[in-house]
Amino acid sequence: MAISLKVLAPNQNVYEGDAEEVILPSTTGQIGVLPGHISLVTAIDIGVLRLRMNSKWKSIALMGGFAEIESDEVIVLVNSAEIGSEINIQNAEDALKKAKSAISKFPENEKSSEKIKALNEVSKAEARIQASKN
């Protein structure tokens, strides 16, 4: 028995297919989904969605959004996403260095919107790197 998985971003249908298992990065921690899962709506954090099909794992970098789980169907609506195998790791590593450099310019206890944006950029780059390695 498989789960029907759809990952949708505003400008693209990122992934549509079956999976034996899905692991989602929710804002409260990872959620593992198997066929017959209880119904649930959750906020998705910046992170990596993992799906298993035919004993092989695939990763998708997610940039925040929402997910709806209904028994054997998972629909993920995100701001943006990238299939791990399509990510240029060098670009992701360069983005991580740039974001970390931007953070280092702020005092440690500062909570400005610019610093929060830089912290988000670090999270996005880390998610892209992690997804590209799986």
Curated annotation (Swiss-Prot):
Superkingdom as given in the UniProt entry? Bacteria
Question: Where is it located?
Answer: Cellular thylakoid membrane
A Pfam family annotated for this UniProt entry: ATP-synt_DE_N
This entry's Gene Ontology molecular function terms read: ATP binding; proton-transporting ATP synthase activity, rotational mechanism
Q: What topology does it adopt in the membrane?
A: Peripheral membrane protein
| GO (cellular component) term, any one | proton-transporting ATP synthase complex
Keywords in UniProt for this one? ATP synthesis, CF(1), Hydrogen ion transport, Ion transport, Membrane, Thylakoid, Transport
* Assembly mode: F-type ATPases have 2 components, CF(1) - the catalytic core - and CF(0) - the membrane proton channel. CF(1) has five subunits: alpha(3), beta(3), gamma(1), delta(1), epsilon(1). CF(0) has three main subunits: a, b and c.
Extract the PANTHER family matched here: ATP SYNTHASE DELTA/EPSILON CHAIN, ATP SYNTHASE EPSILON CHAIN, CHLOROPLASTIC
* Function of the molecule: Produces ATP from ADP in the presence of a proton gradient across the membrane.
Q: Which family does it belong to?
A: Belongs to the ATPase epsilon chain family.
Official protein name in the record? ATP synthase epsilon chain
The source organism is Prochlorococcus marinus subsp. pastoris (strain CCMP1986 / NIES-2087 / MED4)
